[in-house]
């Protein structure tokens, strides 16, 4: 099921910073977002539910040390993904 991506301002800011520095990161992020739209639980994404202070959110891998934090939300009557953060493992957790 295709989902709509709803990036937060902080996600957009972080993704611009990351992709400006590194073309490989830009490509990894683009591919991960395409997979998220098609199937958020594609095995290549390693999607998992978060606990603790990030409870209610999910994380997926967008490359070796790149993670996307998101939530499943309703948007205009269908399921969407609210993109909250992107960065290295240490930056987002």
Positions of predicted regions on the chain:
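A generic structural signal for short beta-strands and their flanking turns/coil linkers
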Residues: 32, 46, 56, 64-66, ...
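Enriched for short, Lys/Arg-rich terminal
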Residues: 4, 13, 23-26, 61-93
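N-terminal first-folded block
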Residues: 7-43
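A short, surface-exposed loop/turn module that caps and links secondary-structure elements
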Residues: 35-59
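Conserved N-terminal entry element of GNAT/NAT acetyltransferase domains
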Residues: 1-7
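Residues that form or immediately flank small-molecule/cofactor binding pockets and catalytic motifs
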Residues: 10, 55, 88
């Amino acid at each position: 099921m295709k989902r709509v991506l709803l990036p937060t301002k902080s996600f957009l800011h972080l993704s611009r910073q990351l992709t400006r520095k590194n073309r490989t990161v830009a490509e990894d992020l683009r591919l991960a977002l395409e997979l998220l739209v098609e199937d958020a639980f594609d095995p290549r994404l390693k999607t998992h539910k978060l606990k603790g202070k990030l409870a209610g959110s999910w994380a997926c891998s967008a490359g070796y040390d790149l993670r996307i934090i998101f939530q499943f939300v309703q948007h205009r009557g269908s399921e969407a993904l609210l993109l909250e953060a992107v960065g290295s493992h240490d930056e987002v957790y």
